[in-house]
């Protein structure tokens, strides 16, 4: 697949549109709201390589070619986290992929794989030794074919209501 490029700050709104589509696909409901405005602002800041922390977010996209306003066909977005070093991870640099989505008009063209491969290369160039993600049922086969597998039991807690 050709046409994969690094996302720019002016892609922020489209990255958030694709993120909303990803949540719709995962949860079966559309959830617009103020989070989108905040997400656009955060994405712009993190994609600006001139600002501190601009290298913590990796984002790769494919531009859409359908008629209408400029839009993205697909994206893969992740971040680098620095932790204490460990025996198999002496640099302590880990990656997390948190947003992979292909607009339904472009599915089946290999864009999710291509953007995710570009993101994995970006992680490797930064000394990341392990990358994690949470796969939807529909995308699990894609990630397994790329070499992802179970690492440990992932547990989460929602602290939004904790005072």
Give the predicted meaning of each segment.
Residues 20-47:
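Conserved GNAT-fold acetyl-CoA-binding loop/helix
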Residues 116, 123-135:
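Conserved GNAT acetyl-CoA-binding A-motif
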């Amino acid at each position: 697949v050709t046409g994969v490029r690094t996302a720019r700050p002016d892609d922020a709104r489209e990255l958030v549109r694709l993120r909303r589509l990803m949540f719709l696909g995962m949860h079966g409901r559309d959830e617009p709201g103020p989070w989108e405005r905040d997400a656009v602002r955060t994405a712009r800041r993190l994609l600006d390589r001139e600002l501190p922390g601009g290298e913590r977010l990796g984002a790769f996209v494919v531009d859409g070619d359908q008629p209408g306003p400029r839009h993205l066909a697909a994206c893969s977005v992740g971040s680098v986290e620095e932790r204490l070093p460990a025996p198999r991870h002496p640099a302590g640099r880990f990656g997390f992929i948190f947003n992979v989505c292909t607009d339904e008009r472009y599915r089946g063209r290999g864009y999710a794989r291509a953007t995710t491969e570009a993101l994995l290369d970006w992680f490797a160039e930064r000394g990341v030794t392990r990358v994690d993600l949470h796969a939807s049922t529909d995308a699990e086969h894609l990630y397994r074919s790329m070499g992802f597998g179970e690492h440990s039991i992932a547990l989460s807690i929602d602290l939004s209501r904790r005072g």
